[in-house]
Amino acid sequence: MPIGVPRVPFRSPGEEDASWVDIYNRLYRERLLFLGQEVDSEISNQLISLMVYLSIEEENKDLYLFINSPGGWVIPGIAIYDTMQFVQPDVQTVCMGLAASMGSFLLAGGEITKRLAFPHARVMIHQPASSFYEAQTGEFILEAEELLKMRETITRVYVQRTGKPLWVISEDMERDVFMSAAEAQAHGIVDLVAVE
């Protein structure tokens, strides 16, 4: 039986009585953002709008992006990444559970020195994929070219964010590479592993 999104009491400054708001709304007010699903256009737009709004509201207070995501679409993910780099506040990233594919890309996109993984978290990187089997031959070639450009972009970002050489990242992206939190730290995707 679904219970829906939990609601918690929240009292706005100057109000006597607390009102009940969904837990995510309450946490957003504390600058805590969550990516707990596959990246798509809808969640991308929601996270981008929250980051922009919160950065306008208070530009010197860090944002926290908690990630437990199997990955998702490339373009919406890159849009989130670009916004993280654009907004004035630092965006601290926290991996809890799994940060795979686009999730690991966003994890690496946090402010360097402020990227954290929980001790039992898993991180996975690989190359972007597409649904070639649905395309006609001409579309297939155009899509393959675009996919190659996306792979180059993602590879360059990983190189910049991790400090690893291009050949290491390129080789890792050839297949699914799963890492523990400590391995992700050694790989430069996160800076710290939380202590149990």
Curated annotation (Swiss-Prot):
Keywords: Chloroplast, Hydrolase, Plastid, Protease, Serine protease. Its EC number is 3.4.21.92. It is found in: Plastid, Chloroplast stroma. Signal peptide: none annotated. It catalyses: Hydrolysis of proteins to small peptides in the presence of ATP and magnesium. alpha-casein is the usual test substrate. In the absence of ATP, only oligopeptides shorter than five residues are hydrolyzed (such as succinyl-Leu-Tyr-|-NHMec, and Leu-Tyr-Leu-|-Tyr-Trp, in which cleavage of the -Tyr-|-Leu- and -Tyr-|-Trp bonds also occurs). Its main location: plastid. GO terms for molecular function: ATP-dependent peptidase activity; ATPase binding; serine-type endopeptidase activity. Cleaves peptides in various proteins in a process that requires ATP hydrolysis. Has a chymotrypsin-like activity. Plays a major role in the degradation of misfolded proteins. This is ATP-dependent Clp protease proteolytic subunit. It comes from Glycine max (Soybean). The gene is clpP.
